[in-house]
Curated annotation (Swiss-Prot):
Its main location: membrane. SUPFAM superfamilies: UDP-Glycosyltransferase/glycogen phosphorylase (SSF53756). It catalyses: di-trans,octa-cis-undecaprenyl diphospho-N-acetyl-alpha-D-muramoyl-L-alanyl-D-glutamyl-meso-2,6-diaminopimeloyl-D-alanyl-D-alanine + UDP-N-acetyl-alpha-D-glucosamine = di-trans,octa-cis-undecaprenyl diphospho-[N-acetyl-alpha-D-glucosaminyl-(1->4)]-N-acetyl-alpha-D-muramoyl-L-alanyl-D-glutamyl-meso-2,6-diaminopimeloyl-D-alanyl-D-alanine + UDP + H(+). Keywords: Cell cycle, Cell division, Cell inner membrane, Cell membrane, Cell shape, Cell wall biogenesis/degradation, Glycosyltransferase, Membrane, Peptidoglycan synthesis, Transferase. InterPro entries: GlcNAc_MurG, Glyco_trans_28_C, GlycoTrans_28_N. The keyword Membrane applies. GO terms for cellular component: plasma membrane. It comes from Idiomarina loihiensis (strain ATCC BAA-735 / DSM 15497 / L2-TR). One of its GO terms (molecular function) is undecaprenyldiphospho-muramoylpentapeptide beta-N-acetylglucosaminyltransferase activity. This is UDP-N-acetylglucosamine--N-acetylmuramyl-(pentapeptide) pyrophosphoryl-undecaprenol N-acetylglucosamine transferase.
Length: 362
């Protein structure tokens, strides 16, 4: 049986694109093993639930940590490479595919030491540290979003793999043309919520007049009551639903006329494939400010408005909402431009690349 080892750890932005590829590889008859970290809380829940064998190594990052960890990093990396080398000798995969997180560095290096083909996928518009390390050593590098840096122009942009359910909903999505009635606003701060959006969006909505809105606001854990209270006095509200978590994001995107959210790589790809106008507020402390670069992918195509968090706090969100919500044609134009950025074949393209290294049938 053909085997692939997938390495992805830490955040959903790394894990969920890898999971989409893993599921498709399994459907194609491949055995899939997964590498995470011993501290990886997300992969320790998600990967076994998807019925993939999960292996782990002792590997930690250096960003945001003290000098001691940085000084010991060469030894930590060498130890992790040896662990990965042993694992690869045991599993004997035909190909290794990395999707981000610190486990990818030692696994990618171990794969090259053993002569195992290495496929690297980078989700963000600014490549992460492990991608920068592995790209010169990889057999194939594929990008989820365009990277503006000149040295990355040689690599193909294939898009970010997305969940099957969301892609199915996107295929059924019709072009938006809500010419009258209430407009639907979706506010998403990520799985943990975003306090700045919980405060700024209600204030901006209360300043509106002459429109009617249905607002669905995902606020994060234990913020439901205070966020809902912040909307008191908003005369333009037809309906308001504040929730800690949205189970079906595909349905939420499908019904939205405008989304106000952060600018993670998967969010950018989901907005594009669903064809929705957006106001993007990048997380200001993201590594290498990669969310601002992600947001510019849609902004540069006329599909989104980019608002730095400092401007949101200073009240710019009010002006943008007034402008967009009183010009429905502008919203539909942005939605159409967003759809033009979509790359729904990302999963299949990555799967095809990995399958290039399958065993001969002879």
């Amino acid at each position: 049986m053909n085997k692939v080892l997938i390495a992805a750890a830490g955040t959903g932005g790394h894990i969920f694109p890898a999971l989409a590829v893993a599921e498709q590889m399994r459907d194609n008859g491949w055995q899939v093993d997964w590498l995470g970290t011993q501290e990886g809380r997300l992969e320790s829940r998600v990967i076994p639930a998807a019925n993939f064998p999960l292996h782990s190594i002792s590997m930690t990052g250096v960003r945001g940590h003290g000098l001691k960890r940085k000084l010991f990093m060469p030894f930590t990396l060498a130890k992790a490479v040896l662990q990965c080398r042993r694992l690869l000798k045991t599993l004997q995969p035909q190909v290794v595919a990395t999707f981000g997180g610190y486990v990818c560095a030692p696994m990618g290096l171990a794969a090259k030491l053993l002569g195992i083909p290495l496929v690297v996928h980078e989700q963000n518009a600014i490549p992460g540290m492990t991608t920068r390390l592995l790209a010169p050593r990889a057999n194939k590098v594929m990008l989820g979003l365009p990277v503006a840096l000149p040295q990355w122009q040689q690599y193909p942009v294939v898009g970010n793999p997305l969940r099957k359910g969301l892609l199915a909903q996107a295929a059924e999505q019709t072009e938006k043309s809500n010419t009258d009635g209430a407009l639907n606003i979706l506010v998403v701060g990520g799985s943990l919520g975003a306090q700045v959006l919980n405060e700024a969006v209600p204030e901006a909505v209360k300043a509106l007049e002459g429109v009617e809105l249905n607002v669905l606001h995902q606020c994060g854990a234990e913020r439901e009551a205070t966020t809902e209270k912040a909307y008191l006095g908003a005369s333009v509200l037809k309906t308001l639903k504040v929730t800690e978590f949205i189970e079906d994001m595909g349905d939420a995107f499908k019904n939205a006329d405008l989304v106000i959210c952060r600018a993670g790589a998967l969010t950018i790809s989901e907005l594009a494939v669903m064809g929705v106008a957006s106001i993007l507020v990048p997380l200001p402390h993201a590594v290498d400010d990669h969310q601002s670069a992600n947001a510019k992918v849609l902004e540069s195509r006329g599909a989104a408005v980019l608002l730095p968090q400092t401007e949101v706090v200073e009240g710019a969100l009010k002006q943008q909402l007034k402008r967009l919500l009183h010009d429905r044609q502008q919203l539909w134009t942005m939605a159409r431009f967003a759809r033009q950025c979509a790359m729904p074949e990302a999963t299949q393209r990555l799967v095809n690349e990995c399958m290039e290294y399958r065993q001969s049938d002879d």
